Amino acid sequence: MFDPASFVKEIGPQLKQKVGNERVLAAVSGGVDSTTAAVLAYNLLGNKVIPVLIDTGFLRKNEAEKIKAYLSNVLPNLIVVDERETFTSEIEGMEEAEAKRKKFRELFYSSISSLMRKFNAKYLMQGTIAADWVETQGGIKTQHNVLVQIGIDTEKEWGFTLIEPLADLYKNEVRELARYLKLPKEISERQPFPGPGLLVRTIGKLTREKLEVVREANDIVEKYLDPFNYSQYFAVSFESDGNFVILDGIDAFLYKARATGVKGDVRAYGNIAKVECSDINTAKSFVDTLVKYDITHVLCSLDERSNGKYSIAIRAVITEDFMTADYARIPKEVLEKISSEILQKIPNVKEVLYDVTSKPPATIEFE
């Protein structure tokens, strides 16, 4: 049984001894992991800790402003650094999921390295948790914040030393710690948000238009699903191009866009399939059949129109530890409201779908 008070009592002397009189840059994304790590360090080390939020251009709608407001009491010295144009222009046009994640990692730590020099900091504090390095070591997908665990020498590569106080904790334990540290509920109970943000929800080639489409769609999805307290819920966008196939008697539409999955504890990068479902609650039979092929995510069609070039998929899951997850059984009328608003408010969206794939065989994020 995890005891946050004991954890803080144990980690405190270790952190103080390691840091000494040096400065620590704490990378904050606004998610529960990185923010908890930063607040833990700030409480223990005071103004030696410089918390920084890098706005990469892949944050949710108005997110940087919201995070700064949420954390005004627990991280009063939080600095927001605007790197939106740098990240977007460097990754724009890139298509393959792992290539995008790795480029993001390169840009992120290059930016961090510059900030470390600017603030004369020796240590970088990160919110890496157990699920991050398990997935990266297993080759399922690159988590941008997993470095030492896969043999990257941060001292040699970027000139700083890593501190990861949460690396042995799972998400539910981090939340307990966040509550103990009195983080605002908007953070402690916040659903996870990947470090690369909307980059990994803009499936396939990154374009500025598609990025803005998913930013707006994600905002609508969160608005409707917030009251349900699902473990994680969001939207992804991808081009609607593809072709119809028949697999084991099932009529399916295979998109050209591909997505990450996990089969037998190893990474799979396969097709996204659409099927017509009369009821999302009974869609498991479709999934069990289709994932035997090169398919990682199975989507149920919700609503569509004749024009438009983008598909929006809604993803909502229920999980304890994020190592496995089941898709949420969202009420039909709620899905209808979400679909209707997305099609009404966002130009160039052709259809709205719902992901009915568990983890495994899918990963929670598409990339």
Swiss-Prot record:
ATP binds at residues 29-35. The keyword Ligase applies. Its EC number is 6.3.5.2. The lineage of its organism: Archaea, Thermoproteota, Thermoprotei, Sulfolobales, Sulfolobaceae. This is GMP synthase [glutamine-hydrolyzing] subunit B. The keyword Transmembrane does not apply. Residues 2-190 form the GMPS ATP-PPase domain. It catalyses: XMP + L-glutamine + ATP + H2O = GMP + L-glutamate + AMP + diphosphate + 2 H(+). It holds the Pfam family GMP_synt_C. One of its GO terms (cellular component) is cytosol.
